[in-house]
């Protein structure tokens, strides 16, 4: 899980979603998981 100020999709499987007001990136590749904060 990477925490960064700006989350960007890395590959085409990455999806940007909002969960409880937190912007997240979910992907099939666990290394691409990100969270904004």
Curated annotation (Swiss-Prot):
InterPro entries xref list: Ribosomal_bL36, Ribosomal_bL36_sp
Pfam families for the chain: Ribosomal_L36
UniProt-recorded Gene Ontology molecular function terms: structural constituent of ribosome
GO cellular component: cytoplasm; ribonucleoprotein complex; ribosome
Record-stated family: Belongs to the bacterial ribosomal protein bL36 family.
NCBIfam families reported in the protein's UniProt record: rpmJ_bact
HAMAP family, sorted: Ribosomal_bL36
Protein name per UniProt: Large ribosomal subunit protein bL36
Organism, as annotated: Variovorax paradoxus (strain S110)
Record lineage: Bacteria, Pseudomonadati, Pseudomonadota, Betaproteobacteria, Burkholderiales
């Amino acid at each position: 899980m990477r925490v960064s100020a700006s989350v960007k999709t890395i590959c085409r499987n990455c999806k940007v979603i909002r969960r409880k007001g937190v912007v997240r990136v979910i992907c099939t590749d666990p290394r691409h998981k990100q969270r904004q904060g």
